């Protein structure tokens, strides 16, 4: 649960408002460790999960009907800071006008960014996790085919990291 601070322009006083959400509450009722970090501008819950608890939380959300991994991506908090893996889940059904959504964030140490793969829960994670591996160097443990997907196989480094130094020259091997 997060406290969001708002300040009234009229009197200059600060009010503290507690942020909760039904998805976070359901995870809490199951005893699954997580932290609700807030809501985005569309009131979608953003939940922080430690890597060792990701699979348990992901399975619980899948069991609760979050059957679609709309997006998975890696991100970099900045040079010297942590890397992360983000999962945007949707509960799709035939009659849903505005289906529930949730965003999970997992923060990883820069020097050893490892997190379990959710491929075995949502198959749409396949190429998305491969892209995060290719661009950020995040290792998705248990992924069936974790190889580069965009960069040449012999590329050195992780091009989307904020501390990446672009090489002055790279020679492509001729396929013929």
Curated annotation (Swiss-Prot):
Keywords from the UniProt entry: Cell inner membrane, Cell membrane, Membrane, NAD, NADP, Plastoquinone, Quinone, Translocase, Transport
Main location: membrane
Topology in membrane: Peripheral membrane protein
E.C. number(s) listed in UniProt: 7.1.1.-
Presence of the UniProt keyword Cell inner membrane in the record: yes
Subcellular location field: Cell inner membrane
Superkingdom assignment: Bacteria
GO cellular component, one term: plasma membrane
Pfam families: Complex1_30kDa
NCBIfam families: PRK12494.1
Role: NDH-1 shuttles electrons from an unknown electron donor, via FMN and iron-sulfur (Fe-S) centers, to quinones in the respiratory and/or the photosynthetic chain. The immediate electron acceptor for the enzyme in this species is believed to be plastoquinone. Couples the redox reaction to proton translocation, and thus conserves the redox energy in a proton gradient. Cyanobacterial NDH-1 also plays a role in inorganic carbon-concentration.
Family (UniProt): Belongs to the complex I 30 kDa subunit family.
Quaternary organization: NDH-1 can be composed of about 15 different subunits; different subcomplexes with different compositions have been identified which probably have different functions.
Protein name (database record): NAD(P)H-quinone oxidoreductase subunit J
Organism: Gloeobacter violaceus (strain ATCC 29082 / PCC 7421)
Native organism taxonomy: Bacteria, Bacillati, Cyanobacteriota, Cyanophyceae, Gloeobacterales
Gene that produces this protein: ndhJ
